[in-house]
Curated annotation (Swiss-Prot):
This is Guanosine-5'-triphosphate,3'-diphosphate pyrophosphatase. It catalyses: guanosine 3'-diphosphate 5'-triphosphate + H2O = guanosine 3',5'-bis(diphosphate) + phosphate + H(+). It comes from the Bacteria. Catalyzes the conversion of pppGpp to ppGpp. Guanosine pentaphosphate (pppGpp) is a cytoplasmic signaling molecule which together with ppGpp controls the 'stringent response', an adaptive process that allows bacteria to respond to amino acid starvation, resulting in the coordinated regulation of numerous cellular activities. The keyword Membrane does not apply. Its EC number is 3.6.1.40. Belongs to the GppA/Ppx family. GppA subfamily. PANTHER family: EXOPOLYPHOSPHATASE, RETROGRADE REGULATION PROTEIN 2. It comes from Yersinia enterocolitica serotype O:8 / biotype 1B (strain NCTC 13174 / 8081). InterPro entries: ATPase_NBD, Exopolyphosphatase, GppA/Ppx_hydrolase, Guo-5TP_3DP_PyrP, Ppx_GppA_C, Ppx_GppA_N, PyroPPase_GppA_Ppx. Pathway: Purine metabolism; ppGpp biosynthesis; ppGpp from GTP: step 2/2. It is an enzyme of class 3 (hydrolase). Coiled coil: none annotated. The gene is gppA. GO terms for biological process: guanosine pentaphosphate catabolic process; guanosine tetraphosphate biosynthetic process; nucleobase-containing small molecule interconversion.
Amino acid sequence: MMLSSTSLYAAIDLGSNSFHMLVVREVAGSIQTLARIKRKVRLAAGLDTQNHLSQEAMERGWQCLKLFSERLQDIPLDQIRVVATATLRLASNAEEFLQTATEILGCPIQVISGEEEARLIYHGVAHTTGGPEQRLVVDIGGGSTELVTGNGAQANILVSLPMGCVTWLERYFSDRNLAKDNFDRSESAAREMLKPVAQRFREHGWQICVGASGTVQALQEIMVAQGMDELITLAKLQQLKQRAIQCGKLEELEIPGLTLERALVFPSGLSILIAIFQELAIESMTLAGGALREGLVYGMLHLPVEQDIRSRTVRNIQRRYLLDTEQAKRVSKLADNFLLQVEKEWRLDSRCRELLQNACLIHEIGLSIDFKRAPQHAAYLIRNLDLPGFTPAQKLLLAALLQNQSDTLDLSLLNQQNALPVDMAQHLCRLLRLAIIFSSRRRDDTLPAVRLRANGETLYVLLPHGWLQQHPYRAEALEQESHWQSYVQWPLLLEEFN
């Protein structure tokens, strides 16, 4: 069956560092990514002191757009949005570039204001990023930095500042020297630019801070490569700065997890981010699921911003893989009941509760491939599917839980994830496995009144007197489960009460 072009949408962002194109297909009220194309054009590097854009920089941009234009030919014009940001807002000869660019693409290009850019970034984050409703969004681009606070779908404070990782690179690291002096000057200039707006942001407050740029993506990749958790903090940023200073020169910058492509603008982006953390008194930051391009696409689709993006993602997976939602709810409800019984002893919090519920709601996804090795298939799918609202670390945890939902346990998977402390992840795994065993008859009226009691790592499963004898299938499964858990030093004791 041919893919209907009417369901295709494209968003192009002519940024100061890179040009990006996102092509998506609308599927049942959400988007499926078909193509993401990114080319480092470094347009901002072509600006001289008079803000005149060099011929070479324009040529780099046009070459990239020729590549994009072929992909756009199958998409209806009213389903394409092309925007230009900081450098083309600033360039005195922007019109010359835009005229040729419009001819190449065959569709209009809109040079958007910094405030409109901030609004679109926030819109993209609101559609793709989970967590609390009240958020601060930070996007460090090539030529500008956007700061936005908002609640749910509504942006409140929108600020765009003329500092970016390309302009700061040319201004403070032009000698390609990673000396402390260069970092100090770069940070100091960024802090001066932030001072007029910082207090307003601090007074407004937020529950979660989200980063939506290549700099933040690079930091995330570095942290994952080094086995850290995914929360970005000022201490980690300072640590990375020291590491960069030790490297001495930009061409010698080597940090595990930092790609060659991102290395050039990494020190300048890092110094801007450090200044933002200091001036706005940010405690921690996570990576956004989307930003400007997603904001453009969702704007064309007119889809409402859901209160809980993770729930929407889980529902879409259940629909797409034809999961038995009744059974998923049954397992989820039982696992939740188990968690509430042991949460004090095991110090399980609301994060644990939500992640356990999500694991339960999609635990049978592996069956859509085959019953044999279903847990492994489930883990593979969860690791590789696009899951809006879930961070990379949360995806790894869900995959680890699903791979360990039955049979022998592989603790290395739970130890390698960093969404939760290892002991919490292990405790969730134990509860998930028990909920699946007790729900195996797939009927509500067969669930016993199970009581759980935890004492350190020992877990007591208390059942009504005679239940084990009357239910030999599940009794055997529980006996086997007790052995499997004991192999990894998780004592599981079955007892009956009158």
